[in-house]
């Protein structure tokens, strides 16, 4: 393993000034060095040496196999480029280290997901508006903009006509240039280096300020980041535009061995380099068919294509399977050992940690709901797509089915010993797979036990996942969700075994009926699994989300906070008023631009 060492090393530049080294306590060495404060882009060697600032920390690796790794790319501007040092420089500079990615890995990975929201239990929930609200806002905004455009164009035409008439009276347009210079400030064409220097706020014209402000508009199309194939033509067009604009003041490029730059190279300098390695166009794969591209999606193999369309369902399946393996396994272990293998507190923590691991497994793909009550609550109050709800529930049930099967198979010998034979199966061990209220609990009490427990679960989840409240640190949400499950189990779970999750009950119950416990597992406690395990949990989840949104949440994605027509009209009026001012300034500049060029 190579260890970074601090040395005072001479530069490899032929310039005399570059041979100066940074004095340090350590010895000198002839190993290749690299700069940790300003890593240039992947350009030619001469330009890379020119762009290094002097008197900076130099770091060398003791291993000779790491020589010649200086030409690493700027990972912030071109993340698809890379090298060995792309992941190590951030460690040396004291910042968090990003994972290394091979230059061609991202392009070959056809499973890249587009920029879509993920309703994850391991991070803040996305803020998404309903289609009806977006269509209403877009329609009103389009109508207001059309009216504003007509008014602005009429004003611009009237000013243009008056300008032509005045220019005809006076053959010299100098007075117009002076008036515009007094109002908007003088315009001076700058070269590429001067244009990037900071300017005083007073020297920026009103038109430039208006152009720098972002335009506010509404669109029904989903936003996504452009691919490399789409970004390259824009870079070339931008580079050509800069070259034409500064052609008059451009100076010939000469070697600057004694000059160090503290800025990043401009677009023109980037394009002038011939050593930038671009991946071949043949292997560039579009993100997804859902991203709006007409190019067919490429897949590594046939299974990758199947997984691409069912990835969210598979994630819910696997996350729920892990949840049930830990939970049902702890139930069976405590039962067959007559309490020696676990207590009620250990069972609660087992279910909580199982839920935590399930969320970590599926959180970045499907959200890690692992619970139909949570999925339905998110669809009602957080705009989770309704067409995904049955898909999620289907995979959650079957994940619980196979999770119960794995736990049962693991404890099969102990269950047989506990029951007294391999053909004997009683509700004593069957109750470890599915839930049932205690015999003395009334049906009203049993129902409201599940109702209240799931309401607390969903209400606390909405609070934890609300980034406008006090969300946990990134990556810690799933751990807190696990603690929440354990706390509910220890405080509100004794009378009904804290179902809280319809899939967790139905999946193992189906397996119990299939393995030999018989249909009696469905008939227990007057078909408890229908009105208790499903009705009580789903109703409680909806109630918990309703209470949180009623008293705390203010986002417009909740049905309790839908914007009415009056709010939309006022908001659109504010936007169009700002739009009119910006368009008026831009049209005034366009009208007077030919006169300035004269």
Curated annotation (Swiss-Prot):
State the organism of origin. Schizosaccharomyces pombe (strain 972 / ATCC 24843)
Ranges facing Cytoplasmic side: 1-313, 368-388, 466-473, 554-598
| Family designation | Belongs to the MIP/aquaporin (TC 1.A.8) family.
Q: Where is the composition biased (Polar residues)?
A: 30-48, 218-242, 255-276
Q: What is this protein called?
A: Uncharacterized membrane protein C977.17
The answer, when asked if Nucleotidyltransferase is one of the entry's keywords, is: no
Q: State if Transmembrane is listed as a keyword.
A: yes
Membrane-crossing ranges are: 314-334, 347-367, 389-409, 445-465, 474-494, 533-553
Where do Low complexity bias regions lie?
Answer: 1-19, 147-165
Q: Which NCBIfam families match?
A: MIP
Short motif (NPA 1): ranges: 371-373
Query: Which residue spans adopt a coiled-coil conformation according to this UniProt entry?
Result: none
């Amino acid at each position: 393993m190579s260890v970074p060492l601090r040395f005072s090393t001479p530069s490899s530049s032929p310039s005399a000034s570059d041979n100066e080294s940074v004095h340090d306590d350590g010895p000198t060495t002839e190993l290749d060095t690299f700069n940790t404060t300003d890593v240039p882009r992947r350009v030619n060697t001469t330009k890379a040496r020119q762009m290094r600032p002097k008197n900076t920390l130099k770091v060398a690796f003791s291993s000779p196999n790491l020589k010649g790794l200086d030409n690493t790319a700027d990972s912030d501007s071109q993340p698809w480029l890379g090298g060995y040092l792309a992941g190590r420089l951030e460690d040396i500079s004291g910042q968090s280290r990003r994972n290394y990615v091979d230059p061609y890995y991202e392009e070959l990975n056809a499973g890249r997901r587009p920029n879509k929201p993920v309703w994850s239990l391991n991070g803040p929930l996305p803020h998404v508006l309903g289609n009806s609200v977006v269509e209403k806002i877009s329609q009103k905004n389009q109508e207001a903009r059309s009216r504003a455009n007509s008014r602005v164009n009429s004003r611009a035409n009237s000013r243009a006509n008056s300008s032509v008439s005045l220019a005809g009276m006076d053959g010299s347009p100098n007075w117009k240039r002076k008036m515009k210079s007094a109002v908007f400030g003088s315009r001076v064409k700058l070269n590429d280096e001067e244009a990037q220097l900071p300017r005083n706020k007073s020297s920026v014209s009103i038109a430039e300020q208006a152009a720098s402000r972002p335009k506010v508009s509404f669109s029904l199309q989903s936003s996504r980041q452009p691919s490399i194939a789409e970004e390259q033509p824009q870079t070339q067009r931008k580079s050509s535009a800069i070259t034409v604009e500064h052609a008059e003041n451009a100076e010939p490029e000469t070697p600057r061995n004694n000059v160090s730059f503290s800025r990043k190279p401009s677009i023109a300098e980037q394009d002038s380099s011939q050593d930038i390695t671009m991946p071949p166009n043949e292997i560039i794969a579009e993100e997804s068919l859902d991203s709006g591209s007409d190019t067919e999606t490429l897949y590594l193999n046939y299974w990758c294509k199947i997984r691409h369309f069912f990835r969210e369902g598979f994630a819910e399946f696997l996350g729920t399977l892990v949840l049930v393996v830990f939970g049902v396994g702890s139930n069976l272990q405590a039962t067959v050992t007559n309490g020696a293998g676990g207590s009620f507190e250990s069972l609660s923590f087992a279910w909580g940690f199982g839920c935590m691991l399930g969320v970590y497994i599926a959180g970045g793909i499907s959200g890690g709901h692992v619970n139909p009550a949570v999925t339905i609550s998110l669809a009602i109050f957080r705009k989770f797509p309704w067409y995904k709800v049955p898909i999620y529930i289907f995979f959650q049930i079957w994940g619980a089915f196979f999770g119960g099967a794995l736990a049962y198979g693991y404890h099969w010998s102990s269950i047989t010993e506990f029951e007294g034979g391999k053909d004997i199966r009683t509700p004593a061990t069957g109750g470890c797979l599915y839930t049932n209220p205690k015999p003395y609990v009334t049906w009203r009490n049993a129902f409201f036990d599940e109702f209240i427990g799931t309401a607390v679960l969903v209400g606390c989840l909405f609070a934890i996942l609300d980034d406008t409240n006090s969300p946990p640190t990134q990556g810690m949400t799933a751990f807190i969700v696990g603690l929440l499950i354990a706390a509910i189990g220890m405080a509100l779970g004794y009378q009904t075994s804290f179902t809280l999750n319809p899939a967790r009950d139905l999946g193992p119950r189906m397996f119990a009926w299939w393995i030999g416990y018989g249909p009696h597992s469905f008939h227990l406690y007057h078909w408890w699994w229908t009105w208790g395990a499903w009705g009580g949990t789903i109703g409680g989840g909806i109630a918990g989300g309703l209470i949180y949104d009623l008293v705390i949440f203010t986002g417009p994605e909740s049905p309790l906070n839908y914007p009415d027509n009056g709010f939309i009209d006022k908001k659109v009026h504010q936007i169009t008023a700002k739009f009119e001012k910006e368009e008026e300034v831009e049209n005034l500049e366009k009208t007077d631009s030919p006169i300035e060029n004269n």
